[in-house]
């Protein structure tokens, strides 16, 4: 049997490089169950992201405006570490966390340029789910 190499060989780990991007886009997807905030550079490459579930909320608490606020703050903080200063906001979906997410991006220190609603509208596409009976 060949002799064993020394225990705990050193592995080279590639570290995430800090992108220095001053202007970008914030994509807020707010559904009835969750809110996802992705901050990208102008080409669309994701720099940071956070969701209500990723921040620590579970179940029906993910769909609250407060959870959306925490997710947006978290994503904005990570983007600011990469040098992000100004964002254009694209909001998608009918959820309750739309406005609070935009406000918390501003509160976290990002300057909001334009705000666009990019919610997809069907031209009579798929049949919607049946009505809820509570």
Swiss-Prot record:
Keywords: Ribonucleoprotein, Ribosomal protein, RNA-binding, rRNA-binding. InterPro entries: Ribosomal_uS11, Ribosomal_uS11_bac-type, Ribosomal_uS11_CS, Ribosomal_uS11_sf. One of its GO terms (cellular component) is ribonucleoprotein complex. Pfam families: Ribosomal_S11 (PF00411). Belongs to the universal ribosomal protein uS11 family. HAMAP family: Ribosomal_uS11. Part of the 30S ribosomal subunit. Interacts with proteins S7 and S18. Binds to IF-3. This is Small ribosomal subunit protein uS11. It comes from Saccharopolyspora erythraea (strain ATCC 11635 / DSM 40517 / JCM 4748 / NBRC 13426 / NCIMB 8594 / NRRL 2338).
């Amino acid at each position: 049997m060949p002799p064993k190499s020394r225990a705990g060989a050193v592995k080279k780990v590639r570290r995430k490089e800090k992108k220095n991007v001053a202007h970008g886009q914030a994509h807020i997807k707010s559904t009835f169950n969750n809110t996802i905030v992705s901050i990208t550079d102008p080409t669309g490459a994701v720099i940071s992201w956070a969701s209500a579930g990723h921040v620590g909320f579970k179940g029906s608490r993910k769909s609250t405006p407060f959870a959306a606020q925490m997710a947006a703050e978290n994503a904005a903080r990570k983007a600011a570490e990469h040098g992000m200063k100004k964002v254009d906001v694209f909001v998608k979906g009918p959820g309750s966390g739309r406005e609070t997410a935009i406000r918390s991006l501003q509160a976290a220190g990002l300057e909001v340029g334009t705000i666009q609603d990019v919610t997809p509208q069907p031209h009579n596409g798929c049949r919607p789910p049946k009505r809820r009976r509570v």
